[in-house]
Amino acid sequence: MTKTQKLVLTSLIVFLTFLFSACSHVAVPRGPIPVKMDVVGPMNVNKAISLENGVPDSKLTLIASQGYHKWYADYNVWSSFIVSQLESELRGRGVQITPNSQEAFRVKVEQTGLFWGSFSTRCIVNVRVERKDGTWSKTYEGNNASPASLNRSVDGAVYKAVVAILQDKDFMNAILR
């Protein structure tokens, strides 16, 4: 082997090693999908509530891998996103949202996964909502597949989790207690 061939082969091996070992992605919801009033109607709640992020630390968690690609999620960011969307949707339905209310709820993303099928990418997100005093809690699932992109499956899964929370009679009963 000549000196030039060794140099090209070594360079190619180093290049391919870096190419295939550094393919990490962070999955984040891009923006809220508004919940229409015909999906979840107005709510008759006469007291103020507060929602807070139940994930204290910001750290990346591996949620999927495919070949050399790895996808991570920061559950603190996802929980903050869902809290923000829930506050907006509840305000739009007549619920008073005030910080540090006695009626406080924690929202916590517990698990997220990305799954590839033949024609679509699926995102499943599990969100726990609990009263701050510990008297009530429930886990909700947002499950969405999109043939278009991974980002759309993430956005749809978060939307479906928010809709599941807003439509749940147990959540309404926990607010009205």
Regions found by a protein language model. Name each.
Residues 6, 13, 39-41, 97-99, ...:
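Generic marker of residues within folded, mature protein domains
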Residues 23-84, 172-177:
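A structural "domain/chain start" motif
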Residues 1-23:
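Sec-dependent bacterial lipoprotein signal peptides
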Residues 24-34, 83, 88, 92-149:
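Surface-exposed short loop/turn segments
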Residues 1, 50-52, 127, 134:
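Generic low-polarity alpha-helical segments
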